[in-house]
Every structure is written in structure tokens, then in C-alpha cells.
Amino acid sequence: MAHIAEMELLPLTIEHKDAPNAWVTNGKSVTVTTGLMNLLQREEEMFGVLSHEAGHAKLGHYGSTVTSSIGIGVAGLLLNQVFGGGALGELAVNVGANLATAGISREMEVEADDFAVDLAFKGGKDPTGIYTALERMSKYGGKLEPSGFNSHPPDDRRLQRMRNRIRERDPSIVIPVID
């Protein structure tokens, strides 16, 4: 996958946890839980998940998150001082900072989803893998209710976007239905 994405190979760590999850750390390594490995049923699904995480690394999301967090923190400190530095001002700044950070994170998740779909097409792989992987994880974890504080967009919105992106690239592709 790294050669398709034109990036360095990322070290892979397997963490023994039941909860299905995967993440990229410091933009330099990927961790996958055994719970995710047990949940996924097709090689294309693991390719999709790893492509999504590689997308975070390739697109520089770790650096962007750190930079954004620092900027939001500094702005928050300044605003808190402008509004008197009291507990209410601090609360308002914290809420605003959390909303801003979550919004940035949601955008990055969509970018990583798009990266995974596009990478599958580029590599001649089945682009439905990321779709069915997310669908399985969504069914396992339950429905994420829309909230400004969520770091990920609601799964149904992500799935619809992926479905549309796949069909734009190749209308003949049939999205598998999972049980």
C-alpha cells in the first residue's frame, strides 16, 4: 500500500483489545486492535482501514492537529483575558475550543475516507472495503448521534459520502450488503 500511496512504510502495531479500532500515532505508525481484526471479514476491508489511517499520515493530519490546537489554545487564552478571566469566560473559551478542534478533526476524517477510496482505485483494489469496514464498525459500536463535539462525522454521513465517491469513480460497482 505504501508504494501506491507514494509514502514511506508505516510500522504496524497490533494491540490486544476487544474494541475494534485503528489509529495513527504521531503521523508515523499505525495501530490496529485485535477486536478490529476479528470484526473485519474481507482483506479489502483491512486494506481500506489501513489506507484511511495512512491517509491521516500522508495528509499531515497529526501536524495540522498540533498546530491547530496550539493556535486555538493561544486564541482561547487571549479571549479569556479580554472577557475578564473569570470562570464563565474560561468555560466559554473551553467550549469554543472543543467545538473548533472537533470540527477540524471531522474534516480530517472525511479527507482520510476520500484518500482510502481513491487509493483503492489507484491500486486496482476493491474500493468498497473501507465502506463495509466502517459499516461493520458502526453496527458494532452503535449509532453516533450528530454533535458539534464529536471528533468523527456521523457514520451514516460518512457511508453516504463514500458510496457517492465510489459511484462517481465507477457507477458499475456494487456496494456489498453486510449482515
What do the predicted segments below correspond to?
Residues 1-70, 122-123, 139-143, 147-149, ...:
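Peri-catalytic and regulatory segments of divalent metal-dependent proteins
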Residues 1-7, 90, 94-151, 171, ...:
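Short helix/loop segments within enzyme catalytic domains
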Residues 30, 44, 69-72, 90-94, ...:
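Alpha-helical membrane and juxtamembrane elements of multi-pass inner-membrane transport
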Residues 143-165:
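Catalytic and substrate-binding regions of cell-wall glycan-acting enzymes that process beta-1,4-linked
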Residues 48, 72-76, 80, 117, ...:
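Generic alpha-helical structural context detector
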Residues 32, 112, 154:
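Residue-level signature of catalytic and energy-coupling elements of molecular machines
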Residues 62-93, 131:
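Post-HEXXH active-site segment of zinc metalloproteases
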